[in-house]
Structure formats: structure tokens, C-alpha cells
Amino acid sequence: MLAHGAGLCYIEEAFHAFYKEALGLTKLSARERARMGLLALVVAAAVLFFCSKSSPAYPINDWSDANIYFSAGKGMLAGRVMYRDLYDHKGPLIYALHALCALVCPADFTGVWVLEILFAAAFLLEGYRAVKAMAGRRAALLSIPLTALCVHTSYCFQAGDSAEELALPMILLVQLHWLESLKSEKPVFLGRLLGDGFLFGCVFWMKFTLCGTQGMALLLGCLLDARRNGAKGFFRSLGGLLLGFLLSTLPWLIYFGLNGALADWLKTYLYDNLFLYSSGEGGLLWRAKQMLKSGWEWLSRSPLCALPVCAGVIASCFGRGKTGWQRIGWLLPFLLGALGVFIGGKTYPYYPLALAAFLPCFFGWLGALLEKRLAGLSKRAYPCIAAALC
């Protein structure tokens, strides 16, 4: 009983710490957070009205993946169990999100469009915070519509409503937490470790090939903690992250366990994806050629997104006064993220969209270069420029 009580107290303390940490994530004043959040919401709604086929602007959404997610979500609402009664190879979270959308708007994709807006606004707001830390508020303000333009008008965005699109804010937030830990000598809060592990789990249970960026950021964070605080720091960080991951997994263990579908879930999502879905042709040389081919297609078809991402990551490796950790802070997560995206041998145009999480790196670098010119603009000019970009 004592052990049980101690465990409950630990979990309660962890949730309280996570809540406190979540309130201070943006490091923005309440007024600025509200204003920038509203701007991000308006920009996201405007751009997705034209760029997502889930929008009311389109009479029909003919993209197969979106229809699969939505149909599976409605099936779950009707009592069918994913992987046991319905078959598809994505993770359970994406179907659960679409079940919520179907609960709100069962007849069309309006609920999905609203979901996309919320996730896009969160991504844009996080990008604002990242650029502000690197280049100041002026550049950060302009980065909101520019980021939306680069992401949602690119070829890799396709018709919208992809796992890659929904994963963007979670990928970026974990990356930002890792970069913030470089600036502080204090141990990472338990709440942040729980939150990062939870976000990693959310992406894992949507599409595990998108976890490369987060996985590398979390590993680097553990290694940095080990360097600063020894083995105790490493295992403290690792334990917090694993507990957060467990919290993201627990709902699915309960759901599939109660429905007698644990084996169906794990076989379909993990085994089938790892050994049946990905291409097994050729050897390492063939796979390397396919990865290079896929990377080139991303660069050539989506230059407005791909070129800034690559330029920003490369630029992040240079600069006076940077430590070795800071020089690899963006690079290694990008490389592992790209490996996860391209290594399968089969690459669809929307796969590299997950790498758009690195766009704030470019706008932060560019904003720092143009800082003096941006400082010369009047305050009234920024809303006008932002509106014009929209």
C-alpha cells in the first residue's frame, strides 16, 4: 500500500510539474501569446482554406488517405475496432483524431479542416517562438505567414490531412525543448521530460517513421544531462521520457486490451509496417540510391520548403561562439529525421513534409542577418507585410 501510495504521489507530482511547465513553454507574455496565437490561427485558417482539400472550398475530397482516416474514424465510432475489424497501416492516434472530427461533422471534412487549422496554428506559434529567440520579434512576426506559405503551398503538402502535417507541431516542440536545454545549466524539469516523452509517443502512435527528429533530440538531451550530472542525470532523463511515452501508450493498451485486439494492433502497425510494407528490394546500395532519388525529388518538386530547410540546417552549424553541442543541435535531428523519412525505399510526395519542422531554423538565421534592416521598419509596416503575404 505504501509503495502504491508513493507511486500515485510520484505520478501526481509529475502531472503537476508538467502542467506548470506547459504554462511557461512559450516564454511569452500572456498578451503576446494571445495576439500571436490569434494571428497564427487566422493565417492557418486562411492558407488551409485554399490548400487543404478538407476545406469547405472544395466540393469533394478525393484524396484516398484522408478518406481512409475519416472512414476508419467513423467505423470506430460505430463500435468497430481498428486492426481487428478495419485494416490500415497507420497508428491508432490518427484514426482516433478523425473519429473526433467525425463526431463533430460526420457528413463532411469540415471537422478535419478545423483539426488541421488547430495543429497548423500550434506549429506556427512554436515557429514564432523559435525565430524570436534567434532573431527577435520583428523577424518572428514575419515568419508566421512565410512559414505557412512554405509549408502549405509546397508540393509535399499534397491535399493536406497527412500524418506528417499533424506531427509538425509535436516534432518542433520537442526540438525546441532540446535547444533550450543547451542554454540552461539546470536539470530539465520532470514535467518537460514527461511532456517530451508523451509527444514522442503521440508521433510514434501516428507514424513511427516520423520519430527520427524527436528521437535524436531526446537522445542528445540525455547525453547532455549525463555530461553535466553523470549517470544519475542520464537515467533521470531517460526515466522521465519513458514514463511520458508510457502515458501516451496506456490508452491504446487499455482500448485494444479490452477489445481483445492487442495482437492485431501490434502485428499490423509494427510487424507489417517493418517487414511487409517497406520495400525489401535490392541491398544497401540500391536503398542508398532510392534515398538520394527521393531526396532529389523533394528538392526539385518542393523547393520553397526544401531549400530553406537545408540552408537553415547547414547555416546552424556555423557561427562565432557556438559550442559543439550547438553546432549539431539542428543538424543531427535533421539527419535522423531525414533517414526515417527516406529509408523505407518507397517514398510518396508527402513523406518529406515532416522535415518542414526545421523551417524556423532558416527564418531565425535569415532574420538575424537582416536584423538591422528589419529594425528600420515602422511597427505599422509589419501587419501590412504580414497581410500582404497572407
Question: Model segments located where?
Answer:
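Loop-to-helix entry region of an early transmembrane alpha helix in multi-pass inner-membrane enzymes
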Residues: 92, 96, 105-125, 157, ...
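Specific aromatic-rich, kink-prone transmembrane helix
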Residues: 166-185, 192, 200, 221-223, ...
